[in-house]
Amino acid sequence: MEKSMQPIQLFELASRQAEWLSVRQEVVATNIANANTPKFHAKDVSPFEAVMQATSQQVGMARTNPAHLGESTLSENIAVRDNPVNNEIGMQESGNSVGLAEEMTKTGEIKRQYDLNASLVKSFHRMMLMTVKR
């Protein structure tokens, strides 16, 4: 029985997560920038797992070259939604629902996830280079 080499999906998965993290960071930065804007409601993006399930269920058109037809980007599948009001913070008198402490915590989470993503890609790339050199 002949074994064929399967394509390595780690780089694609890491790229998709990096794009999702970028969109999430943009949404969190918008929340922080509008912390004093009256009636602004904090937003967040759909979880990465939900985005991956949505993109995996889409059937793409077969093509011989990736440059021939533009594929929908992951960003189109990331839903930005209003955050539910945090009961600890509540709604401010101005109608604003942004909690700076919560948004800064999200920023830290995003940085940690991005650093882990970059470290995994770097380690896997190094491992592939060592394999090729042998």
Swiss-Prot record:
State the UniProt keywords alphabetically: Bacterial flagellum
Sorted alphabetically, the Gene Ontology BP terms of this entry are: bacterial-type flagellum-dependent cell motility
Subcellular location(s): the record lists: Bacterial flagellum basal body
**Any Gene Ontology CC annotation:** bacterial-type flagellum basal body, rod
What InterPro entries would the database entry show? Flag_bb_rod_N (IPR001444), Flagellar_basal_body_rod_CS (IPR019776), FlgB (IPR006300)
- Sequence intervals crossing the membrane: none
Pfam families, per the entry: Flg_bb_rod
Protein purpose: Structural component of flagellum, the bacterial motility apparatus. Part of the rod structure of flagellar basal body.
Family, similarity comment: Belongs to the flagella basal body rod proteins family.
Assembly with partners or alone? The basal body constitutes a major portion of the flagellar organelle and consists of a number of rings mounted on a central rod. In Gram-negative bacteria, at least four rings, L, P, S and M are present, whereas Gram-positive bacteria lack the L and P rings. The rod consists of about 26 subunits of FlgG in the distal portion, and FlgB, FlgC and FlgF build up the proximal portion of the rod with about 6 subunits each.
Per its record, how is this protein called by name? Flagellar basal body rod protein FlgB
- Annotated source species: Agrobacterium fabrum (strain C58 / ATCC 33970)
